[in-house]
């Protein structure tokens, strides 16, 4: 029997983000997922090592790695459309859930127990909350990159995403802002000069 899961996942590289905005550099959901996994890992480690919190770091990273799985079937719906009203948002959440269930069903039964739980994440878990913050951090960093390249198209998005991140009242996010975000405004020569 043939299983299509990884062939579908490999198509993440063809699905573009920020479709309604002019970008100086396109971003696909595969590279975005890698960014979110790295940032979620950082936030989980900060929670555990800096603040003494309890979190499953591996689960956080795996939730992040698979957090865009549904989009290989649905595409990336622009945020203003996704959150236009409760009805659209609820319908889209249901569509995402069904797409994730379908994707999990594309794995051999022997693998589903170890992979499906990360595709069908527990959205109420602390690990998933860190992933959602990392997802927004990734978007914020994209805004910084675009603004640094002279693209003012991302100014409003940067402002609203930054406000959202601070409104989460997550010490891990504030720590990341203080310790790491300033470096995203530096050139390669400035980074090497530190």
Report residues per predicted region.
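Alpha-helical, largely C-terminal catalytic domains
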Residues: 1-194
């Amino acid at each position: 029997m043939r299983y299509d899961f990884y062939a579908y996942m490999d198509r993440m590289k063809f699905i573009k983000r920020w479709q309604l905005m002019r970008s100086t550099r396109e971003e696909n959901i595969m590279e975005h997922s890698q960014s979110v996994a790295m940032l979620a890992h950082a936030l989980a480690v900060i929670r555990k090592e800096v603040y003494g919190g309890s979190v499953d770091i591996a689960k956080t990273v795996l939730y992040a790695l698979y957090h865009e799985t549904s989009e290989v079937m649905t595409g990336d719906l622009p945020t203003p459309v996704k959150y236009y009203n409760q009805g659209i948002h609820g319908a889209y959440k249901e569509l995402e859930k069904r797409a994730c269930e379908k994707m999990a069903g594309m794995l051999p039964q022997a693998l589903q127990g170890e992979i499906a739980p990360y595709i069908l994440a527990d959205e109420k878990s602390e690990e998933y909350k860190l992933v959602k913050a990392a997802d927004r951090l990734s978007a914020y960093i994209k805004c910084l990159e675009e603004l640094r390249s002279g693209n003012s198209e991302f100014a409003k998005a940067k402002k609203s995403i930054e406000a959202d991140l601070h409104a989460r009242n997550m010490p891990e996010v504030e720590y990341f802002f203080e310790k790491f975000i300033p470096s995203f405004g530096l050139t390669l020569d400035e980074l090497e000069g530190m």
